[in-house]
């Protein structure tokens, strides 16, 4: 919001689809962490620990599949609504298509796969360094993950959102923020569980984090929804407030 040339005007569908769906995913995460129903029975369980198995992983994947279906439905509806676009928009679309055809498909896939491998390797180094730093400083691994690792791995998402905001593509900027976080929770939690089960490792132990951190995510999402819902735009003062809430959560996380 701070990088946008004007107040960010947001489509109603983005607010009601992406924002609320992310809120629902975070609430489900909190429920899954809090209720023993989602924990797989094991012998000699560790205290304050949940054990997640196939059921939780499939539920998270199902949530993401539903979200992708909603995105696909919105995309098809958008195409139908844009069939009667004027000549100027058609010319702009043609120019964009010509620009995309500059690179061949194999070259594009090469860049995508290469960047994914690069970011994956960089993320691995970031995680190991952050955990080591937390051990040296006596900071809980959950806090390091919530603050340092989350911020570091979100840099690409932030760059994409900033670029979209500068271009006036506000819906894309907001959807990228919520969509990436939905992916992180639904897929990045479920796939390691499935991989561990496939390798015969049994249920994945989840040491219950500070519930206050999850609660802070819900509170921040509700504030964002209130701002987006009020006139369906995000002003610079509101952006400053959201940024302040983030720094407040970071500071408070060290006291939980």
Which residue stretches match the model-derived regions?
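Hydrophobic alpha-helical segments, chiefly the membrane-spanning helices
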Residues: 1-256
């Amino acid at each position: 919001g701070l990088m946008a040339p004007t107040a960010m005007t947001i489509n109603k569908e983005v607010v009601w689809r992406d924002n609320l769906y992310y809120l629902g995913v975070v609430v489900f995460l909190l429920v899954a962490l809090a209720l023993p129903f989602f924990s797989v029975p094991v012998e000699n369980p560790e205290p304050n620990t949940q054990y997640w198995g196939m059921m939780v992983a499939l539920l998270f994947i199902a949530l993401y599949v539903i979200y992708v279906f909603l995105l696909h439905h919105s995309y098809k509806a958008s195409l139908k609504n844009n069939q009667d676009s004027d000549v100027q928009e058609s010319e702009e679309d043609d120019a964009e298509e010509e620009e995309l055809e500059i690179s061949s498909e194999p070259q594009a896939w090469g860049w995508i796969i290469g960047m994914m491998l690069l970011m994956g390797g960089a993320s691995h180094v970031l995680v190991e360094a952050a955990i080591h730093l937390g051990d040296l400083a006596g900071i809980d691994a959950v806090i390091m993950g919530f603050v340092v690792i989350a911020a570091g791995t979100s840099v690409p998402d932030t760059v994409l959102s900033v670029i979209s905001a500068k271009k006036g593509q506000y819906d894309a900027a907001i959807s990228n923020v919520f969509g990436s976080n939905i992916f992180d929770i639904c897929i990045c939690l479920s796939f390691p569980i499935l991989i561990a089960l496939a390798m015969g490792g049994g249920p994945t132990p989840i040491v219950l984090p500070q519930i206050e951190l999850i609660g802070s995510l819900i509170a921040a999402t509700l504030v964002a929804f209130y701002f987006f819902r009020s006139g369906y735009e995000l002003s610079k003062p509101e952006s400053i407030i959201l940024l302040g809430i983030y720094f407040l959560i970071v500071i408070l996380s060290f006291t939980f």
